[in-house]
Swiss-Prot record:
Record-given protein name: L-type lectin-domain containing receptor kinase I.7
Membrane topology (Cytoplasmic): 307-668
Gene giving rise to this polypeptide: LECRK17
Catalytic activity reported: L-seryl-[protein] + ATP = O-phospho-L-seryl-[protein] + ADP + H(+); L-threonyl-[protein] + ATP = O-phospho-L-threonyl-[protein] + ADP + H(+)
Major location (coarse): membrane
Active site annotation, chain numbering: D468 (proton acceptor)
Compartments where located: Cell membrane
Originating species: Arabidopsis thaliana
Glycosylation site list: N56, N125, N167, N201, N223
Function in brief: Involved in resistance response to the pathogenic oomycetes Phytophthora infestans and Phytophthora capsici.
Residue numbers binding ATP: L347, G348, R349, G350, G351, F352, G353, E354, V355, K372
Lineage: Eukaryota, Viridiplantae, Streptophyta, Embryophyta, Tracheophyta
UniProt topology in membrane: Single-pass type I membrane protein
Length: 668
């Protein structure tokens, strides 16, 4: 009797535990009576039709639908799954839609995910706390995630940037060719996703067509256990909107752990797509009057909104700006050039502002530009700043990034410069995912920047002190020629005048020791250029706190290598083909320019001759006075002493554009 009672208790425990396990396979022919689904955000079920809606015609929405029970695989089971669903995407305006995804994730928490092209499961940083595999039906074109078109299907792993994608289509076995499908048509589309081993296949077809014999997408390198870091997963759908909107519907859904046991959807039981009928209905007279009244009210609102908007975005033009007319751009032209400062044109964030790519008309062709939006808290100093910007526009040298003009609007200044397609030099020095620049190219860039600095110091109408020379401020044009940019910290003064400024500005590691006492001069630019020479040759930043003390400071480390008669070992280890004599000469020149004593540094005219081989380096040694000695600016907690320092701990400062930092006195 006791034995029977124990067996009964064990059986009851087994039944209770089993009730908490996933129920697979499952099928929903519609969503009229739904169990085991969890909806959040804008997702809802339309009771009248039994249809699942992810988003509607409201901007910046996110909708999720999960099968509420996790799918679990025993250690003896292979991780595989098959799913089949019918969806419909309906435009809600022009432009319309961002599409939707079917996803597999290790959690139902998508905290930090963003709307628009990130589908409510990813974000613009390319990181998410939730590990996820997704199949996207994408109806927008976003260049920052490398979309191939505004009508494609992609496979995403932990990022909105697809590992493989293709334009939406299906293989017709009858016609023996691919036939295009328009995702954002409002017509029902069948989607099959099959995963087994490391292969993921995705197939599409119009409603009532058989599953194609050839998949649209096939990836053979997906390890779902590694992606999810476990054998437990949630499955579901996500959709999102931005300023572009669409209706995203799921009509039916089936899921199984294997293709063989995947249930079919009964197409006859599927709900109809809302708003899909094109049949025109007659309009009653009363309704016509009502619509006319609504139109009149809407028109009045639009007129008021237009007048308000025109006043809100009116430009600031003062009498003293008339002399700068030819280089002043209208706000309207820059707004159109950047597509309304759209995130799709966003290039990055530089000193004190965001930068956007723009396209401006120029005679019979288009000109690509970079437009930086800089905030300015007041009118104090604006006149002087604009005057200096205009003066710098007159600088003409092949190795300078041209400043084209400006626009002023309320408390905002917009600076327009030439667009540099290959970005900033620091990306190629410190981002090891990019191809390393060969030595001959690096040397050519060093000569370009030396020539530009020599021009600023000795050949321009006024002496120009750059004050922020570093790899992040060196841009690369289409031919990878070096161009010196970011004149936001620069100052001009007449020859023979006192060049001292009211505040020490620059980037820690590049700042000469005399900056705090004597102010900026051409000599402080030479010091920074010396550090830049070492930076480019060694492929390292001037100060790297994460390294051992012996290697932490670049100047000191290069000097120590020279003392050990192994100066060539200081070079970037990624350099393969190079002249040892050239590399050692550039390293010695870098130490000479970064001499602690200002009077011992060469002028930029001499530096150009040294680099071009027209002049031999003077004799000096690693133990010579001032050689390899660190500036106190690199050793002390400078930000507490000097109010206007900028730190460059990553290469995100400048990317594919010139970043004009704005500084007036000790303010921003």
């Amino acid at each position: 009797m006791i034995r029977g009672l124990l067996l009964g208790i064990i059986w009851m425990i087994f039944c209770v535990c089993s009730s908490f396990q996933q129920e697979t396979p499952f099928v929903y022919n519609n969503f009229g009576h739904v169990d085991h689904l969890h909806l959040d955000g804008s997702a809802r079920i339309i009771p009248s039709g039994g249809i699942l809606q992810l988003t509607n015609a409201t901007n910046s929405q996110i909708g999720h639908v999960f099968y509420e029970k996790p799918i679990e695989f025993k250690s003896s089971e292979s991780v595989s799954f098959s799913t089949y669903f019918v969806c419909a995407l309906l435009p809600a305006g022009d432009p319309s839609g961002h599409g939707m995804t079917f996803f597999v994730s290790h959690s139902t928490d998508f905290k930090g995910a963003e709307a628009t092209r990130y589908f409510g499961i990813f974000n613009r940083n390319g990181s998410t706390s939730t590990r996820v595999l997704a199949v996207e039906l994408d109806t927008s074109l976003a260049s920052d995630v490398k979309d191939i078109s505004d009508n494609h299907v992609g496979i995403d792993v932990n990022s909105a940037e697809s590992i493989t994608s293709a334009n939406a289509s299906y293989f017709s076995d009858k016609e023996g060719k691919k036939i295009d499908i328009k995702l954002l048509s409002g017509d029902p589309i069948q989607v099959w996703v099959d995963y087994e081993g490391t292969t993921l296949n995705v197939s599409l077809a119009p409603l009532r067509n058989k599953k194609p014999s050839r998949p649209l997408l096939s990836s053979t390198s997906i390890n779902l256990t590694d992606i999810l870091q476990g054998r437990r997963m949630f499955v579901g759908f996500s959709g999102s909107t931005g300023s572009s909107m669409s209706y995203q519907y799921i009509l039916g859904w089936s899921f199984s752990k294997s293709m063989a046991s995947l249930p079919n959807i009964d197409i006859s039981k599927l709900p109809k797509v809302p708003h899909s009928s094109t049949k025109k209905k007659s309009t009653s007279p009363v309704l016509s009057v009502l619509l006319g009244l609504i139109a009149f009210i809407v028109l009045g609102i639009l007129v008021v909104a237009y007048l308000y908007r025109r006043n809100l975005y009116s430009e600031v033009r003062e009498e003293w700006e008339k002399e700068y007319g030819p280089i002043r751009y209208s706000y309207k032209s820059l707004y159109k050039a950047t597509k309304g400062f759209n995130r799709s044109e966003f290039l990055g964030r530089g000193g004190f502002g965001e930068v956007y790519k723009g396209t401006l008309p120029r005679s019979r062709e288009l000109r690509e530009v970079a437009v930086k939006r800089v905030s300015h808290d007041g009118e104090h100093g604006m006149k002087q700043f604009v005057a200096e910007i205009v003066s710098m526009r007159s600088l003409k040298h092949r190795s300078l990034v041209p400043l084209l003009g400006y626009c002023r609007r309320k408390h905002e200044l917009l600076l327009v410069s030439e667009y540099m397609p290959n970005g900033s030099l620091d990306h190629y020095l410190f981002n090891h995912d990019r191809l390393s620049l060969p030595w001959w190219r690096r040397l050519a860039i060093l000569r370009d920047i030396a020539s530009a600095l020599s021009y600023l110091h000795t050949e321009a109408d006024q002496v120009v002190i750059h004050r922020d020379i570093k790899a992040a401020n060196v841009m690369l044009d289409a031919e990878f020629n070096g161009r010196l940019g970011d004149f936001g910290m620069s100052r001009l003064y007449d020859r023979g005048a006192d060049p001292s400024t009211t505040a020490a500005v620059g980037t820690v590691g590049y700042m000469a020791p005399e900056l705090t006492t004597m102010g900026a001069s051409t000599g402080t630019d030479v010091y920074a250029f010396g550090v830049f020479l070492l930076e480019v040759t060694c492929g390292r930043r001037p100060v790297e706190p994460g390294l051992p003390e012996a290697k932490r400071f670049l100047i000191k480390w290069v000097s120590e290598c020279w003392k050990r008669s192994s100066l060539i070992d200081a070079r970037d280890p990624r350099l393969t083909e190079f002249s040892s004599q050239e590399v050692e000469k550039v390293l010695k020149l870098g130490l000479l320019c970064a001499n602690l004593a200002p009077d011992s540094r060469p002028a930029m005219e001499q530096v150009v001759q040294y680099l071009n081989g027209n002049l031999a380096l003077p004799e000096f040694w690693p133990n010579s006075p001032g050689i390899g000695v660190l500036s106190p600016m690199a050793l002390s907690p400078a930000p507490l002493v000097i109010p206007s320092l900028s730190f460059s701990s990553s290469s995100s400062n400048n990317s594919m554009f010139i970043t004009h930092s704005v500084l007036y006195g000790s303010g921003r």
